[in-house]
Amino acid sequence: HTADNGAKSRFQVSFADSVKTSNDWTAGQSNLNVRQVFVELSDLPSFEGTAFANSTLWGGKRLDRDNFDIHWIDSDVIKLAGLGAGIYDIEVADQWTSNLSVYGRSFDDFPVIARDDTGNDDTDSFIVTTNNYFGNWQLMLNAMSAADNDTRDLGNGSTAADSGLHTMLAYHGDSFFGLGEGNFKTALLHGQGLGAEVKGLGADGNLTEDASATRLAVYGTTYLAPQWRIAPSVFAEHSEDRYDE
């Protein structure tokens, strides 16, 4: 929607439904989920002439706009989602735009160490993220906190992480590795503590406080013939102390 003063607003709701039957009436087996419900505001007149002139404000429950994956094998490179608010496309300088967001997620119904049991077996996880673009380069920085997650009983004496750090350096190429027409993306991700689930930010509360992981993702697409494309991809990951064993 475009207002009289030129400001634009967009409202989105996304539903997901899980069923395990082929029948036409599935109400008894259906699991309906509101996956996204959020609003965006852009082209605000009060931002004219500032670094926020082309920015978009948002709030609600959503999948982050700048997530990306290898869609044909259904594998995320980076996925950030939850309930939150933020701003996209701040023009910090020439060839430098930045996104700032805060997301919240929940860890529910986890076992608690007996000596720390206060009757609470859930907590909220908060993610503060900044996503920066310098031409084709992307630098993403994330900090995570989940109060009392360290009271989670992991089973063998390790302490669950109640905080974490995560970073991703990515390059979005506009050719097939410089060899021909097409595109490619490469990303190097590293996380510690709650950030050690490097492709799903803040999604795993079972990570230990000593957890660390580094992941490399590379993929590209190009045409071998007018109706024939090739799309190679490579994943590699090294991790330590992610789970209590």
Regions picked out by a protein language model, each given a short descriptive name:
Residues 1, 30-35, 79-83, 120-126, ...:
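Residues that define the transmembrane beta-barrel architecture of outer-membrane proteins
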Residues 1, 9, 35, 89, ...:
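Polar/charged side chains located within well-ordered beta-strands of beta-rich proteins
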Residues 1-49, 98-100, 131:
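Beta-barrel outer-membrane channel/assembly domains of diderm bacteria
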Residues 10-17, 52, 57-64, 70-72, ...:
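Transmembrane beta-strand segments that form the barrel wall of outer-membrane beta-barrel proteins
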Residues 50-129:
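Internal, well-ordered domain-core segments that constitute the primary functional module
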Residues 95, 133-148, 156-245:
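Detector for outer-membrane/organellar transmembrane beta-barrel domains
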